[in-house]
Amino acid sequence: MELVFIRHGFSEWNAKNLFTGWRDVNLTERGVEEAKAAGKKLLDKGYEFDIAFTSVLTRAIKTCNIVLEESHQLWIPQVKNWRLNERHYGALQGLDKKATAEQYGDEQVHIWRRSYDISPPDLDPQDPNSAHNDRRYANIPFDVVPNAENLKLTLERALPFWEDQIAPAMLSGKRVLVVAHGNSLRALAKHIIGISDAEIMDFEIPTGQPLVLKLDDKLNYVEHYYL
């Protein structure tokens, strides 16, 4: 069986080189075109889906909608869940990546961005931009909503959704599309493929490119490739 991952199209803050994380930003025109191209590619390759999973962030939701529309499948059920959100970049969210490197040093910023288990500084829960002040997370316990994450914590947060929603859907015979974010998809790919803590640092997923994970009937990894 096949599982298709798509990272959202190029966003406004990708274009501005800002740390985004859980901040809710829109797609650029380039991002819209990437999503359209992904949908057309899926249509041309004959990919059909029974259900789509995405995050609760606009850039992923819009990408999912565009992909499904272009592949003539906008009617299928979509499940939106915060566990597929991008990695939370803590107090770095909204900061310019280059300016942050100049302030803290390239090495420190590289550690925050690429270390598997070291998180950036926490975002104050009282900050106006904190997820604690966003009603889309109102039903999540206060101590469960992150203030900063590394990739390890992102995987720990995303894994229950894989186990409770995505994997059961696939095992029941449903054809699944997941449209999410660079780090939430990398985290899930790490689990599915069996990528080591060291190797995952160099495993990248480009925006708007369908990644196909081929699995056996017990969801054991076989191979992966881009369309």
Curated annotation (Swiss-Prot):
Binding annotation for substrate: 7-14, 20-21, 59, 86-89, 97, 113-114, 182-183
UniProt-listed Gene3D superfamilies: Phosphoglycerate mutase-like
GO molecular function: phosphoglycerate mutase activity
Naturally occurring in which organism (per UniProt): Haemophilus influenzae (strain PittGG)
Lineage of source species: Bacteria, Pseudomonadati, Pseudomonadota, Gammaproteobacteria, Pasteurellales
SUPFAM superfamilies, per database record: Phosphoglycerate mutase-like
Pfam families per the UniProt record, alphabetical: His_Phos_1 (PF00300)
SMART domains from the UniProt entry: PGAM
Enzyme class: isomerase
Pathway given in the UniProt record: Carbohydrate degradation; glycolysis; pyruvate from D-glyceraldehyde 3-phosphate: step 3/5
Primary gene name: gpmA
InterPro entries: His_Pase_superF_clade-1 (IPR013078), His_PPase_superfam (IPR029033), Phosphogly_mut1 (IPR005952)
UniProt-listed PANTHER family: PHOSPHOGLYCERATE MUTASE
Family note: Belongs to the phosphoglycerate mutase family. BPG-dependent PGAM subfamily.
Name listed for the protein in its UniProt record: 2,3-bisphosphoglycerate-dependent phosphoglycerate mutase
EC number(s) from the headed UniProt entry: 5.4.2.11
GO BP term (any one): gluconeogenesis
Role description: Catalyzes the interconversion of 2-phosphoglycerate and 3-phosphoglycerate.
Annotated site location: Transition state stabilizer: H181
